[in-house]
C-alpha cells in the first residue's frame, strides 16, 4: 500500500446511488478513469443491495474479473450489504475486493493521497438514534445510525458523504427554492462539525447549492468553504446528473483557493449534535442545567445559562505566559476573530527568530524544546522546599505550528513523542520534589504557535486539581469530556491531570473561550489569584537568567537532551 508523502491536488469522481448495480457502476468508473485519470472515487447510497446484487457480481469483483482500477470508497447506505460481503469483511477487513473499500455505517478514512473522508451510512430513525448505546445493536445489515456514530465522526475532514440529507440545506441560499428531502438535524450538526470541503448525498434529484462558508473560527489558510452536492441515482431514467468530477486541493497555503464569489453563510451554523430527545429534560449537553457525567460517553456537561458569569467575561488577559509580548494582539479575541498571520521570522516561539529570548530556553531536543515563561505563575515561595525554581515551564514544538494536527504525519508523530518525553521528564522532576504536574494546552487552527504549559502543584494540594477545573468549567459554561484528543483533532482545550485522566473541552464555533482559563484554575488551586495576569509577574532579565539556571540544575538528572 503506497501513501504519498506530499499532499497534492487530486482529481476525484463521485457517482450517485447504483442501487445494487455494482458491476455496472465499477465499469462506468473504469471507463471515465481511462479518459481522465482520477485518483479515487466515491459511490453514494447503495452500491450493493440485497435485491439487485447477485452472488456472481461479488465473485467477479473478488476474482478481479471486473477490476476496480482506482481506490473506490462506499458506505452501507440504506439497503444493507449482501451476506457474502459481510462475511468477507469480518475475516479480511474493509477491502471487499482489490481497491474497493467499505466504510461501514460510520467510517473515517485517510486515502492513499492523505485526504480524509468521513462517511455516515444508514437512515435516521429517531427511536433508534436516541437509544442507550447498550441497547442499540448495529450490524452491516442495520439500516440506521446512532447518535454515537455522529459523535465519532465530528472532526475535520476533506470529504463528507452520507445516506441521509441534512435539514435546512436551502437556508441562506439565494437559489430558487426546490422541493428536496427534509433531511435531519444530526446530519446538519455533523456538517457543522466536520467542515468538509465537499459534502455529498444521494438524492432523488441532482441539486448543488452555492458554496457556503463554515465559520471564521477556522483560519482562512485552512479553508472554510463547503460545496454541497446531491447526485441523482446512477443512470436514472430522467437523465439527471448522477456523476460529479472535481479537483480536491490540500488545505495548505501552497494551494490556497479564494472563496467563490457566490458563497453564502452556512445553513448549519450553531448546530450542536443532538444527544437527547427534545421532550427530555436534557435536550443537548449545552442545554442541561445540571453538571453531570454522562453514562454513555463519560462526558462532563454544563449548561450555558451561566455564560454571563465573571469567568466568561474575562478575556482581556493573555492566552499564555509567552516568551515575550508577541501575543498581546490576541487579548480579548474569540475563536472567530481573524488576525494577520505570524510567520516563523516574527514568532517568538520560533528559534529562527533573531529576537527570541534565548536565556529562557532550558532544554532543546530534536523536535521540541522547553523554555521558561515570562511572568511564571509559581515561585519558590509557592513551591515545596525541594523545588528550587519556579518550576513553571513551556514545552514547545520547534516547527512553527499553530496545532500539532497541522504537521505532516511523520512530524506529528515525532513531535508528539518528544513533547510527551519532556512532559514525563518534568513530571518525574516534580514528583521527586513532592509535587504533581498540571499540564494544559489550547489548540486552535488560527493560533500562533502551539505549546504546553506545565505547572508544579504540591502534592498536598494536587487532589484539588480536577474538582477546581470542573467547578470553574461549570461556572464558565464549558463542556468537558473525559478522553484524549483524536489524531489531528483541532480546536480544543486539554488538561492532563496527575491521575492520568485527560479532560477535553472542544472549542465551538464562535465561542468566546477564556484564554487564561488554565492559568486561572491553577492560580485558584495554589491560592495565587493575584498572579493570574502574567504581565504582573514579569521579572528582570537578570532574575530570568537566574531562574533559568535554577531550573536547569533541578532538571539535570532528567534531561535526556
UniProtKB/Swiss-Prot annotation:
Q: Where is the composition biased (Polar residues)?
A: 320-337
- One MF term in the entry's GO annotations: RNA lariat debranching enzyme activator activity
Asked if the record carries the keyword Transcription regulation, the reply is no
**Entry keyword set:** Meiosis, Nucleus, Phosphoprotein
Give the InterPro entries listed for this entry.
Cwf19-like (IPR040194), Cwf19-like_C_dom-1 (IPR006768), Cwf19-like_C_dom-2 (IPR006767), HIT-like_sf (IPR036265)
Q: Per its UniProt record, what Pfam families does this chain match?
A: CwfJ_C_1, CwfJ_C_2
Q: Spell out which residues are annotated as carrying Phosphoserine.
A: 296, 317, 319, 331, 334
A single cellular component GO annotation: post-mRNA release spliceosomal complex
The residues forming the signal peptide are none
In this entry, which stretches build a coiled coil? none
The UniProt entry, under Gene3D superfamilies, shows: HIT-like
Tell me if Transferase is a UniProt keyword of this record.
no
**Which segments carry the region annotation Disordered?**
286-338
* Compartment annotation: Nucleus
User: For this chain's UniProt record, which GO biological process terms are given?
Assistant: meiotic cell cycle; mRNA cis splicing, via spliceosome; mRNA splicing, via spliceosome
Chain positions found as Phosphothreonine: 298
Classify the main location: nucleus
Entry similarity comment: Belongs to the CWF19 family.
Q: Say what the protein does.
A: Has a role in meiosis.
Protein name as annotated: CWF19-like protein mug161
Amino acid at each position: 500500500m503506497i501513501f504519498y508523502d506530499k499532499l497534492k491536488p487530486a482529481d476525484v469522481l463521485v457517482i450517485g446511488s447504483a442501487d445494487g448495480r455494482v458491476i455496472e457502476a465499477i465499469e462506468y468508473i473504469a471507463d471515465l478513469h481511462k479518459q481522465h485519470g482520477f485518483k479515487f472515487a466515491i459511490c453514494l447510497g447503495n452500491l450493493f443491495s440485497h435485491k439487485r446484487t447477485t452472488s456472481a457480481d461479488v465473485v467477479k469483483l473478488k476474482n478481479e474479473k471486473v477490476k476496480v482500477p482506482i481506490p473506490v470508497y462506499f458506505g452501507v447506505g440504506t439497503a444493507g450489504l449482501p451476506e457474502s460481503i459481510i462475511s468477507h469483511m469480518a475475516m479480511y477487513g474493509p477491502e471487499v475486493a482489490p481497491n474497493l473499500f467499505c466504510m461501514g455505517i460510520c467510517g473515517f478514512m485517510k486515502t492513499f493521497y492523505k485526504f480524509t473522508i468521513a462517511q455516515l451510512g444508514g437512515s435516521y430513525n429517531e427511536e433508534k438514534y436516541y437509544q442507550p448505546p447498550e441497547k442499540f445493536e448495529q450490524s452491516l445489515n442495520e439500516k440506521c445510525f446512532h447518535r454515537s456514530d455522529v459523535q465519532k465522526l465530528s472532526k475535520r475532514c476533506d470529504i463528507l458523504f452520507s445516506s441521509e440529507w441534512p435539514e435546512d440545506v436551502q437556508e441562506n441560499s439565494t437559489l430558487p427554492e426546490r422541493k428536496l428531502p427534509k433531511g435531519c438535524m444530526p446530519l446538519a450538526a455533523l456538517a457543522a462539525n466536520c467542515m468538509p470541503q465537499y459534502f455529498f448525498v444521494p438524492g432523488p434529484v441532482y441539486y448543488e447549492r452555492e458554496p457556503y462558508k463554515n465559520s471564521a473560527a477556522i483560519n482562512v489558510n485552512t479553508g472554510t468553504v463547503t460545496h454541497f452536492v446531491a447526485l441523482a441515482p446512477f443512470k436514472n431514467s430522467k437523465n439527471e446528473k448522477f456523476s460529479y468530477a472535481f479537483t480536491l486541493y490540500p488545505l495548505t497555503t501552497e494551494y490556497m483557493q479564494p472563496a467563490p464569489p457566490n458563497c453564502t453563510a452556512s445553513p448549519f451554523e450553531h448546530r450542536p449534535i443532538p444527544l437527547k430527545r427534545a421532550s427530555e429534560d436534557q435536550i443537548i449537553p449545552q442545554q442541561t442545567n445540571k453538571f453531570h457525567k454522562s453514562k454513555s460517553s463519560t462526558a462532563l456537561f454544563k449548561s450555558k445559562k451561566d455564560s454571563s458569569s465573571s469567568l466568561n467575561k474575562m478575556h482581556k488577559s493573555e492566552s499564555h505566559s509567552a516568551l515575550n509580548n508577541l501575543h498581546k494582539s490576541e487579548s480579548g479575541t474569540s475563536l472567530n476573530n481573524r488576525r494577520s498571520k505570524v510567520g516563523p521570522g516574527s514568532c517568538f516561539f520560533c528559534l529562527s527568530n533573531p529576537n527570541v529570548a534565548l536565556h529562557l530556553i532550558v532544554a532543546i531536543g530534536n523536535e521540541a524544546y522547553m523554555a521558561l515563561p515570562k511572568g511564571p505563575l509559581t515561585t519558590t515561595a509557592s513551591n515545596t522546599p525541594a523545588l528550587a525554581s519556579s518550576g513553571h515551564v513551556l514545552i514547545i514544538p520547534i516547527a512553527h505550528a499553530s496545532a500539532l494536527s497541522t504537521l505532516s504525519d511523520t512530524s506529528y508523530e515525532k513531535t508528539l513523542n518528544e513533547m510527551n518525553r519532556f512532559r514525563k521528564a518534568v513530571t518525574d522532576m516534580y514528583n521527586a520534589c513532592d509535587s504533581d504536574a498540571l499540564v494544559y494546552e489550547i489548540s486552535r487552527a488560527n493560533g500562533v504557535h502551539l505549546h504546553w504549559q506545565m505547572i508544579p502543584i504540591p502534592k498536598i494540594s494536587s487532589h484539588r486539581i480536577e474538582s477546581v477545573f470542573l467547578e470553574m468549567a461549570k461556572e464558565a459554561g464549558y463542556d468537558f469530556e473525559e478522553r484524549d484528543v483524536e489524531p489531528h483533532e483541532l480546536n480544543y482545550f486539554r488538561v492532563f491531570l496527575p491521575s492520568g485522566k485527560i479532560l477535553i473541552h472542544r472549542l465551538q464555533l464562535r465561542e468566546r473561550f477564556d484564554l487564561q482559563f488554565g492559568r486561572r484554575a491553577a492560580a485558584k488551586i495554589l491560592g495565587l489569584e493575584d498572579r493570574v495576569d502574567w504581565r504582573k509577574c514579569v521579572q528582570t532579565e537578570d532574575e530570568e537568567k537566574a531562574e533559568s539556571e535554577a531550573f536547569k540544575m533541578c532538571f539535570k538528572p532528567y534531561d535526556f537532551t
